[in-house]
Amino acid sequence: MMKSIQLCILLWCLRAVCCHSCELTNITISVEKEECRFCISINTTWCEGYCYTRDLVYKDPARPNTQKVCTFKELVYETIRLPGCARHSDSLYTYPVATECHCGKCDSDSTDCTVRGLGPSYCSFGEMKE
């Protein structure tokens, strides 16, 4: 009886690891432009999931400890025209779309690597247009 419970727990853990690996997922983000003074929601794809990582107890200064995160491997950019902007303003908005994901080091030059970023639904204007 105890062995079958342990086996079930082991299989459940293996399922959690393999089924929630780093992969593409659909998300909704808020986009805004200063000239338009409002936000709209758009759908795109981004990377989500778990990556195997470890934090060493004894730190070795000669070997940097890099945590792996689920991040994009390939990106394309799409452009939309924001509706309802002022007549002479630039209403084009370009946003990233992930096309391939992997577990790797977070690139702070192109990604918000903070623990608590603003989040994809943040709108600085406080007004969302449908």
UniProtKB/Swiss-Prot annotation:
Residues with glycosylation annotation: 26, 43
Assigned keywords, A-Z: Disulfide bond, Glycoprotein, Hormone, Secreted, Signal
Disulfide bridge map: 22-70, 36-85, 39-123, 47-101, 51-103, 106-113
Domain of life: Eukaryota
Gene Ontology CC: cytoplasm; extracellular space; follicle-stimulating hormone complex
Residues in the signal sequence: 1-20
Pfam hit, one: Cys_knot
Impact upon substituting residue 73 to R: In strain: Sprague-Dawley
GO function terms (MF aspect): follicle-stimulating hormone activity
Compartments it resides in: Secreted
GO BP annotations listed: follicle-stimulating hormone signaling pathway; G protein-coupled receptor signaling pathway; ovarian follicle development; positive regulation of bone resorption; positive regulation of gene expression; positive regulation of steroid biosynthetic process; regulation of osteoclast differentiation; regulation of signaling receptor activity
Physiological role: Together with the alpha chain CGA constitutes follitropin, the follicle-stimulating hormone, and provides its biological specificity to the hormone heterodimer. Binds FSHR, a G protein-coupled receptor, on target cells to activate downstream signaling pathways. Follitropin is involved in follicle development and spermatogenesis in reproductive organs.
Family under the similarity heading: Belongs to the glycoprotein hormones subunit beta family.
Subunit and partners: Heterodimer. The active follitropin is a heterodimer composed of an alpha chain/CGA shared with other hormones and a unique beta chain/FSHB shown here.
Protein name, UniProt field: Follitropin subunit beta
Organism taxonomic ancestry: Eukaryota, Metazoa, Chordata, Craniata, Vertebrata
Gene: Fshb
